[in-house]
Amino acid sequence: MAKRNVKGLYYITHVNNLHSILQYGILSHQQVEKQNIPYTHIYNPEIVANREARKTSDGYSLWAYANVYFQPRNPMLYKVISETDKNEVVIVGISPQALDIKDAFISLGNAASPLSPILEVDKGLELITGEYWSIINSDWWKTEDGTKRKIMAECLVPNVIPPRYIHSIYVTNQTTADKIRPILNNFTLPVAIVVEPHMFFQPRKHGPITHQLFWVDGDMFFSQMQTLTISVNTVGVMGKGLASRAKYQFPDMYVVYQDVCRAKTLKIGKPHLYKRETSLDEDLADVPSSLPNLNANKWFLLFPTKEHWKQKSDIGGIERGLQWVVNNYETEGIQSLAVPALGCGLGGLNWKDIGPMMCRYLSGLDIQVAIYLPQEQEIDPEFLTRKFLLGE
């Protein structure tokens, strides 16, 4: 059965609700009110109200169903941790056996949206593990192609998902794990506490190099830095790696990139800064209009590491590009900067060579700079030290 591909279901909630969830299970909104259970809300009232109006084929409102996600790292979680201290948010891991609960449904996307079909479980699973699978397992989404809605696909269970289906609690850091451990000690069934910062859009690991410069193991496209650096060639092709993701996630940036390549103004040693005028929250958060403060506009630094996409990265050209950053970041208005390990991965360069060179230049900037480690290489901790990277 297709269900074998579904490793778990997930419920996003406030840490204050854990005690009642472990006691009563994950309740529908209707049951929370009916049983008068104290509950700390993390969802916008407008979102909750929208769900009341939509009904399943059984004639019941979505309020009558406990709803869990197939993918918790989604626009709703992004919105929640934009409004709530991430240390107060937990994700409850549910066994996929909950899909067998009688009269459950699957919504192919955010169930509140009329664009999301609500289907019986067998048909819904066939689609979730088929054409929707790559969307469910994606690291990003867009409004235009529907992936922002579809990645929030839900399993809808009448009234309650009993506590026996709970197998894990995911948290963003060890502090939250320590906070909830006493709660779980009183729960008779075994439940694992899993520290998984990536699930909460946080770096897996990070460490200081100087007071302004640090290395990060994580997803650069969720960085809080104002400007994101994209490694590119100068012939207008974004085929693989970070550039390929940027091309599809930010098509307006790709248009600008092609324009500067055609105009031959993008050259080795001369990056191009695209000052985008759209907040990343608008792209990533569910119902971004209700966020109290949208984050600042995200800029892109198109940084050539080679001339042709078939070539290996040009370390001399990268060094000239870094010098350009040093000379121009203040006048261009760059306030903080995220940079991948330039030329590593598909470019063929090694962190042992490029890391120290990047740090020599970027450590002199009077702004915060995050260097994102190459995902294609395992970096030994000794090559992440200040002594190795700066010779100090």
Functional labels for PLM-detected ranges:
Residues 66-70, 232-235:
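Short, hydrophobic, well-ordered secondary-structure elements
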